[in-house]
From Swiss-Prot:
InterPro entries hit by this protein: BBE, FAD-bd_PCMH, FAD-bd_PCMH-like_sf, FAD-bd_PCMH_sub2, FAD-linked_Oxidoreductase, Oxid_FAD_bind_N
Function: FAD-linked oxidoreductase; part of the gene cluster that mediates the biosynthesis of notoamide, a fungal indole alkaloid that belongs to a family of natural products containing a characteristic bicyclo[2.2.2]diazaoctane core. The first step of notoamide biosynthesis involves coupling of L-proline and L-tryptophan by the bimodular NRPS notE, to produce cyclo-L-tryptophan-L-proline called brevianamide F.
Glycan attachment points: 50, 86, 109, 403
Record's protein name: FAD-linked oxidoreductase notD
EC number per UniProt: 1.-.-.-
Residue ranges annotated for the FAD-binding PCMH-type domain, each copy included: 124-313
GO biological process terms on file: alkaloid metabolic process
Family: Belongs to the oxygen-dependent FAD-linked oxidoreductase family.
Source species of the chain: Aspergillus sp. (strain MF297-2)
Amino acid sequence: MHYIRELLIVVFTSCPALSYAHSSLDGSRYCRCQPGEACWPSLADWQALNSSIQGNLVEVRPIGHVCHEPTYNKAACERVSKLSSNGTWRANQPGAQQEYAWEVSLSRNESCYVGPDNPTEPCSQGRIPRYSAMVETTEQAQKAIMFARERQLRLVIKNTGHDSGGRSSAVDSFQILTQRLKDITFIPEFTPTLGLAEGTYKSKGPSVRIGAGVLTKELYAAADEHGYTVMGGECATVGIAGGYIQGGGVSTALTPMLGLAVDLVQEFEVITAEGRHVIANEFQNQDLFWALRGGGGGTFGLVTSVTMPVFGAMPAVISELTFESQEPGEPFWRAVKEVIYATRDLSTGGNSGQYWIGRGPTGSYFVRLTLFFIGEMDTGKMGGKVGSLLSALQDQEIGFHLNSTAYDRLSSFLAIPQGEFVGGIAFHQENILIPRGFYDSPEGPAELVNRLAEVKLNPGDMWVANALGGKVMANKDSVDNAMHPGWRTAAVLLVGNRIFEPVLEAQRAVQERMTAVEGPLLHSLGPPGPVAIYLNEADADLENWQEWFWGEKYNRLRDIKRKWDPDDLFLVRHGVGSEDWDEEGMCWIQMSIEECPVREPSQCTCPSFGCPMRHVPGLL
């Protein structure tokens, strides 16, 4: 017995700890500081931080608190209710996410929904942070990071709050909001910062440096004004430099031609867990540069800017074909199969496209196919390009509408904000990457249609499929980053979106159905089956997420994470290293001594707030 006690002391003291936060005496967990504990910052501490960042610290309540007693305010509640769908407004609110799902805490049964219907219903903090540093400069962000590090707080980074996995919110957390970092700088001849590298480097041509808080619509508008085309997504209120680009970055219009957004990144500016402001590119901090390109947002540091190339004006014809059906019978699903064939064939020719299969608010089913013909200006040719599809629809006696518009600059189309007022929707997502081999097989498209037909869609639910292939596949041997190798064989990204009523029971039901029923239904497609899952639009309860998101690259990501952030200050749900922590990233889960991430146990580096007690097999 004395031997066991002495051994435990050795195991504990082999991990140098700077200070201890709350700990459980069973030896299984060590936790970050939480409200109500002695280690939680005092009011004076918060005031000192506020002064050091020029008054940009705020105490946070959920945006819906004005709709609930005891803080109910009828006028304020009506105002918040009207603004709730505005994604730009939500991006700027530290007490909001873009999706209701990540404002609530299912584990605690805590919610604070927006709306005047139930003012007597309790309003709880949920996953909304306790405080937010709404930083305006790199220096302010550095001070906020060091405060979180020194005080052992659960830190979250919010860019805009667009995240299907809950990465930008957490229970009892301290938030850094990057929305005020709005710099957009166009650089006629960009040369990466060489650091210690010797010699000179040829210019990479025109580029743009994008601050962490820049929204997609802001970047598109600025690029169009300067005569450039730039890579980005389709939702106007997504932040470019945050999880979008660090998780991969798909562009409906440009990905088949240019690749993933992350494939184009030339340089990052990053604040590390030590509070250092560093540059990561192909010449310096190359391992960090590799990890940031696909390793996920909020994980390796706080990105303050990203630099990527811009392109000249691109003429384009954009065609949209729509049809609907009150009942999704065999003719409807045969028509869907023809849409899949058409998208496959057109993307093979270098064009890009996206199709939606959904159910509208009245209950009818619809399909919307959007195709981008880059370099074209003659709308009269579009009927010929999709002629086989139109003939197939006519054979099925499916009425359709086709509209084509020519743009002398694709950038002028991209600058029209899309999806700006879809904030606050309660929905969950899931997705799969479908390989080219499956799409090209004789049975592939038919099998996919059969699986889609098996899933019951409720009003508001939809499938969205983006064409990949093209440059994404061509970059297999020329681009080395953290993206799952499956992207380099994928033809289509298929995303499922499921709407639910803003009540906890409905949220649980939808999440359970996606994880237990719909996910396995899609994962079993093939052969060849799904090759990967896009972490930015994934099932929040996905199992084996390390393999699905990163595959063989995960171990290298873990090593880089340990080097740059050994204390896991930057931590997100289903992010690199998060398996060592509980669901909320608050407490370190017991690990065996063999898992200590160093060569010798005596050199074990643990979080600065203390080392979790290591389990010694056969003794405990």
